[in-house]
């Protein structure tokens, strides 16, 4: 249960940054090198990440993806069509809202690595992979006191390193308010690093277009209360309500879908435990349950609804199941559309 909780905490957010010398990408998500419109990266490209500068003289060919309780980074690599660069991947979610993605992730090489107690890649195993790029969900993935190879050790071995911008702290704590723009920044930056900036631009444009179309359908409609639940994921608690979404990228997703999270927090709190008494007096129009390796997630959703017959969501049996699209990654548009159809079905008939 502790490992499940750690997975959810790390999945909460991620983005990244880049600045530089020849071709450069800055901390501003909208700033891209001119080469992005040409569909290729002009090397060398220098990137500022978590206060340090990394220079790529060519596209990475031996990429290692650390676990960190995330799936957004490896999903972005798959979406960008550069999965063949991965020599060892430790990320896996077991389900996806995008057809064939979970299977594509499972098919990536793992490097035959025995993970440590944190279910991630220990120092010696990492160095033995001879990577030229290591991607970690947070700064903690390079913490020596956790048994990981440091960014300095990897640089000495010839590997650049990359951490999403908001997660540079050792604990991986999220800074600022995560939004879908963070997912676009991740795609844009990985596209630049891996010589597919044009492909990144197309993915971003497709997502923006899909979200705009969905948002237009629900524009002017009353905002509906959406409860986002991670069943059984609480710290040492198997309750359905011990891990309810508070602050996170998902609030931007819900907003663009014409909904609102009644338990939204802007103080950095990602999950909250809500009592049944409080839930009973909170009007809920749509229930979203997040599936992480559940044997019967539909039964879980129906069990939750049955406890609150007064909810509009219960009266209409109104729930949706999501997996990876609610987190940072390349497919937030999928979550936006599914939640919009959940709480504003009349706008999609």
Positions of predicted regions on the chain:
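Bacterial Sec-exported substrate-binding components of ABC uptake systems
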Residues: 2-14, 18-76, 192-230, 283, ...
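Stable alpha-helical elements in mature extracytoplasmic
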Residues: 69-73, 122, 146, 150, ...
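Structured C-terminal subdomain patch of bacterial secreted/periplasmic proteins
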Residues: 177-186, 266, 278, 282, ...
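Short helices/loops that flank or line small-molecule/ion binding pockets
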Residues: 120-133, 148, 152, 273-283
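Short helix-initiation/N-cap motifs at beta->coil->alpha
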Residues: 49-51, 112-122, 266-276
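Extracytoplasmic ligand-binding site segments that recognize negatively charged/polar headgroups
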Residues: 94-97, 140-149, 159-189, 221-249, ...
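Alpha-helical, coiled-coil/dimerization segments enriched in small aliphatic residues
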Residues: 240-271
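A short, structured surface patch at a secondary-structure boundary
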Residues: 67-129, 133-134, 138-142, 262
């Amino acid at each position: 249960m502790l490992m499940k909780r750690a997975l959810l905490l790390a999945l909460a957010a991620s983005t990244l940054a880049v600045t530089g010398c020849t071709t450069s990408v800055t901390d501003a998500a909208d700033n891209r090198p001119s080469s992005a419109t040409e569909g290729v990266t002009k090397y060398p490209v220098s990137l500022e990440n978590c206060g340090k500068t990394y220079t790529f003289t060519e596209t990475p060919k031996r990429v290692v993806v650390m676990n960190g309780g995330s799936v957004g980074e490896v999903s972005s690599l798959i979406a960008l069509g550069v999965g063949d660069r991965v020599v060892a991947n430790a990320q896996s979610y077991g389900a996806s809202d995008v057809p064939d993605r979970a299977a594509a992730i499972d098919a990536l090489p793992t490097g035959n690595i025995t993970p440590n107690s944190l279910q991630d890649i220990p120092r010696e195993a990492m160095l033995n992979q001879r990577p030229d790029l290591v991607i970690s969900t947070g700064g903690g993935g390079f913490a020596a006191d956790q048994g990981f190879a440091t960014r300095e050790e990897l640089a000495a071995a010839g590997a650049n390193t990359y951490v999403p911008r908001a997660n540079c702290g050792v604990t991986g704590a999220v800074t600022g308010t995560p939004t879908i723009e963070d997912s676009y920044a991740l795609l844009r930056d990985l596209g630049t690093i891996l010589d597919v900036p044009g492909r990144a631009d197309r993915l971003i444009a497709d997502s923006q277009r899909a979200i705009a179309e969905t948002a237009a359908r629900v524009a002017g409609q009353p905002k509906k209360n959406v409860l986002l639940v991670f069943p059984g994921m609480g710290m040492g608690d198997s309750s359905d309500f011990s891990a309810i979404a508070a602050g996170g990228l998902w609030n931007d997703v819900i907003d663009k879908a014409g909904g609102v999270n009644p338990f939204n927090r802007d103080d950095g709190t990602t999950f909250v435990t809500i009592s049944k008494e409080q839930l009973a007096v909170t009007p809920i129009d749509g229930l979203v349950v997040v599936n992480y390796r559940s044997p019967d997630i539909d039964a879980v959703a129906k069990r939750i609804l049955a406890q609150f017959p007064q909810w509009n969501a219960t009266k209409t049996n109104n729930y949706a199941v999501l997996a990876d699209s609610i987190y940072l990654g390349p497919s937030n548009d999928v979550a936006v559309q599914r939640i919009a159809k959940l709480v504003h079905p009349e706008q999609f008939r």
